[in-house]
């Protein structure tokens, strides 16, 4: 394990070793995503002049801005306590870390991709071929399950151009929408796995109370993204019918109105179901139905 004292003290005042060290990506889309999640979870901080460190206001958490692919290794070695990174990078690094939660964003597939006009049907057919990838470890392990071995060309980016440049016969790369593959006249031959953005922690469980509090806050943000708050008025005689449509987690919140024959209902509904729910409520006599965004919640 890397001693915690190897990192320079952050800020001033409190002992930095009593602060949880959270590694987040220093740049790129994942950096923006991580920063947004932390802000939504109520973590206020200021990164000055693209510095490497920032202290969270009001919580014993220090942020360390790192290369995304270094976060799994640094977490496993104890240089940081927790980190936000991609599950693909954890697997590639072979890092011994605990996944505390998945954020449900940054989802992608790691796949073998070949030219459209090649008739490969199985990754085993790439035995002895040249494969360009940013994931040599994962690629080699997967090929071994196929009793195959290839010449791996390790790159840090622009993998999809390597076949046209004559560097490789196939590539292993992350695929989201597939538009980049289509633009380069490539197709997916075989998928290796599915990955997403996750929060990880090492086995020391240092600053456990702070870590658990951070997880709770982030879980509230992630859960809120899946739900909306629906409010409506309903005749009291139809409340039982309405509850079947909008049962909520435990039960809906029901408030009295000036008209004693009516009541107001508040309930959380999955965002993908809101439109249908509103239509069904209207059919049984509900009125004043509207949807509100939830930014954070605890259940």
Curated annotation (Swiss-Prot):
The keyword Hydrolase does not apply. It comes from Rhodopirellula baltica (strain DSM 10527 / NCIMB 13988 / SH1). Belongs to the ATP phosphoribosyltransferase family. Long subfamily. Feedback inhibited by histidine. Transmembrane segments: none annotated. It is found in: Cytoplasm. The lineage of its organism: Bacteria, Pseudomonadati, Planctomycetota, Planctomycetia, Pirellulales. This is ATP phosphoribosyltransferase. It comes from the Bacteria. Pfam families: HisG, HisG_C. It is an enzyme of class 2 (transferase). GO terms for biological process: L-histidine biosynthetic process.
């Amino acid at each position: 394990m890397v001693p915690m004292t190897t990192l320079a003290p952050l800020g001033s005042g409190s002992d930095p070793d009593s602060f949880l060290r959270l590694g987040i990506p220093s740049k790129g889309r994942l950096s923006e995503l991580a920063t947004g999640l932390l802000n939504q979870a109520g973590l206020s901080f200021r990164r000055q002049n693209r510095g490497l460190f920032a202290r969270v206001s009001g919580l014993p958490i220090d942020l360390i801005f790192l290369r995304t692919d270094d976060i799994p290794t640094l977490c496993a070695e104890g240089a940081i306590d927790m980190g936000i990174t991609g599950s693909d990078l954890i697997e590639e690094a072979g890092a011994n870390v605990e996944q505390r939660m998945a954020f449900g964003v940054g989802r992608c597939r790691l796949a073998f991709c070949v030219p459209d006009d090649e008739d490969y049907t199985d990754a085993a057919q790439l035995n002895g071929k040249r494969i360009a990838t940013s994931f040599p470890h994962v690629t080699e392990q997967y090929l071994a399950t196929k009793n195959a071995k290839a010449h791996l060309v390790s790159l840090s980016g622009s993998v999809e151009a390597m076949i046209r440049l004559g560097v490789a016969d196939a590539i292993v790369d992350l695929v989201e929408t597939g538009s980049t593959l289509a633009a380069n006249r490539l197709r997916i031959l075989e998928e290796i796995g599915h990955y997403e953005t996750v929060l990880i922690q090492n086995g020391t469980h240092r600053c456990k109370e702070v870590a658990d509090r951070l997880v709770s806050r982030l879980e509230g943000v992630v859960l809120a993204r899946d739900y909306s708050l629906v409010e409506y008025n309903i005749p009291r005689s139809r409340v039982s019918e309405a509850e079947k449509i909008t049962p909520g987690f435990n039960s809906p919140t029901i408030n009295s109105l000036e008209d004693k024959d009516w009541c107001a209902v508040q309930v959380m509904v999955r965002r993908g179901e809101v439109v249908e729910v509103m239509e069904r409520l209207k059919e049984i006599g509900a009125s004043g139905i509207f949807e509100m965004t939830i930014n954070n919640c605890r259940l």
